[in-house]
A protein has these predicted regions:
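Bacterial N-terminal signal peptides that target proteins for export
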Residues: 1-10
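C-terminal motif of bacterial Sec signal peptides marking the signal peptidase cleavage site
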Residues: 17-20
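Acidic/polar, low-complexity intrinsically disordered N-terminal segments immediately downstream
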Residues: 22-99, 174-176
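Beta-sandwich strand segments
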Residues: 29, 150-164
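Short beta-strand and strand-turn-strand segments in soluble, beta-rich domains
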Residues: 95-112
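Short proline/glycine- and polar residue-rich coil/turn motifs
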Residues: 111-120
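Ligand-binding face of N-terminal immunoglobulin V-set domains in extracellular IgSF glycoproteins
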Residues: 123
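Short glycine/proline/serine/threonine-rich loop/turn segments at secondary-structure transition edges
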Residues: 130-142
């Protein structure tokens, strides 16, 4: 009798569970596509580590290298597109110590997000000549960037709208 009742409850639970399942799990995104800087990294354990800054150091690069290109991943949230779209990057002047033409080369504030891509890259050429080479008295140069909304993109998550880039010419302590 007890076993019969237990079987009945088990069967009833299974029916309720199957009844509640919905096979339509595709929830099409309805809003405007959003753009953001990739603001996390995934460690070897699969955990996401969130950060609002990127360290770029010439410390281990041979001294003959006078400039290098920083590659910032940019990602968007939303539906894919089969056409190129534009996004806007501006410099946050009150948080920036870097000088255009001295610490980095000028870049276009309007950038192209390539068609059929989920992530793209913002390229910034960093110049080595004016960077401090002394760790003890070394200065970290800051360049703070901010994404702005365009006709093609709204802004993404708060943590990915602004990105602080710190660059120097000495062996810096790792951020991990």
């Amino acid at each position: 009798m007890k076993m019969n009742r237990l079987s009945y409850y088990f069967l009833l639970s299974c029916v309720a569970l199957l009844w509640s399942c919905d096979q339509d799990i595709d929830y099409p995104y309805q809003g405007k596509d959003r753009i953001q800087f990739q603001h996390y990294t995934v460690d070897w354990n699969g955990n996401r580590n969130y950060s609002d800054s990127t360290l770029f150091s010439f410390g281990l690069i041979p001294s003959e290298v006078r400039e290098d290109t920083l590659k910032l991943p940019v990602e968007y949230l939303g539906n894919g597109s089969d056409r190129d779209r534009t996004y806007k990057v501006s410099i946050v002047a009150d948080s920036t110590t870097a000088v255009e033409g001295v610490h980095y080369l000028a870049f276009n504030s309007l950038q192209t997000f390539r068609a059929n891509e989920l992530t793209d890259t913002l390229y910034i050429v960093v110049l080595r000549e004016a960077l401090s080479k002394d760790y003890a008295e070394g200065e970290n140069i800051r360049l703070e960037l901010k994404l702005e909304a365009t006709d093609d993109f709204a802004l993404g998550l708060d943590g990915g709208i602004q990105r602080k880039i710190v660059f120097n010419d000495f062996m810096a302590e790792p951020t991990w």
